[in-house]
Amino acid sequence: MAVVLFMRVPELSLERYDLMMAELELDANPPPGAILHIATEAVGSVNVCEVWQTAEAAESFVERRLRDALAGHRVKEPLSYRIEPLHNLFAPDLEMISRIGASSVAALPHHRSLAS
């Protein structure tokens, strides 16, 4: 069952978030089961919303890759997140994601065909 992961990452600036995302090499090595990643800036934190194929896939990414990456960027607060079942995902214009310039999805050739 598809799920949504919600996470607030305190102590993380957008600059360090961008560095961490580059270091994770998600374009070249996407985590199994990942569908969509959205990040926003909040006061003193970055908020993340992700859609995953399963809760197990989301938890595996957090435990095997994300925790170490956050530690490498001096995030000391314990990571907290919640996972909820996905009820609906509506995306009427997938091509807009690459046009707004906030996406790494377009870097993956197999994703371009999904937006066509």
Language model: regions and residue ranges:
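Short S/T/G/P-rich N-terminal loop/turn motif that feeds into the first structured element of a domain
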Residues: 1-47, 53-67, 74-116
